[in-house]
Amino acid sequence: EDKLDYTLFEKNVCGGEVFEEVSKDLNFQGRIIDDLEKKFGKNNEDVLFQKKFYTLVELEHLEFINILNDQCDLGMATILFFYSNEEKGIEQSEEVGRLLNTVYARNSDSLLIYSFDVNLDSNLISKLKLKYDISESPVIVVNEKIKIFNPQNLEEIEQTLEKSEDESDGSSIIYLN
């Protein structure tokens, strides 16, 4: 609803508390997913349904943050984290998740991280995987421009954040058009 106030009903998008207002629902929905996964398991049908809704909420939030960055010079960096809860990739995904938690803690005023389950049966996830050429996990996409397969340490992620506008140096980083 808050996002609609700014987009559809033409409320001043660059107003003081816009970021906080549009972020409240995202944070609330994320906590619900965490609680449901702990209570019922990551593969529970109701949990998976809620994750589909959360994917939509995340993408709407990302879209709005892009508007704030473009029109209001918000200066918020973004990381899209593509992970797997399947046995084959869960350990690597959880390790990258821990790294991202640390990166976020160090940069919480200027960074947003959006997490997407690559195995979720969702048209939105399929479209994201196609858009960012995601065929495995874990993968992060920094500022929707730079893709890193299975980042190994904090420095790799933080350096990529710092130089997200620079050209590739030949590592496991891929620059997207």
Where on the chain are the PLM-derived regions?
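Non-globular targeting/processing and membrane-anchoring segments
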Residues: E1-A77, D166-N177
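Non-catalytic, surface beta->alpha helical segment in thiol-disulfide oxidoreductase systems
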Residues: K3, F19, E136, V141-N177
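Second-shell loop/turn segments in exported
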Residues: K38-V47, S84-E91, K145-K147
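Sec-exported extracytoplasmic/periplasmic mature domains
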Residues: L62, A105-S108, E162, D166
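Coiled-coil termination/hinge junctions
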Residues: D73-F82, S93-E95, L120-D121
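Loop/turn elements at helix/coil->beta-strand transitions in domains of secreted/extracellular proteins
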Residues: M76-A77, S108-L112, E136-S137
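Thiol-based oxidoreductase modules, predominantly thioredoxin-like and allied folds used
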Residues: F81-N85, S108-N123
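Typically the conserved alpha-helix immediately C-terminal to a functionally engaged Cys/Sec
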Residues: I90-N107
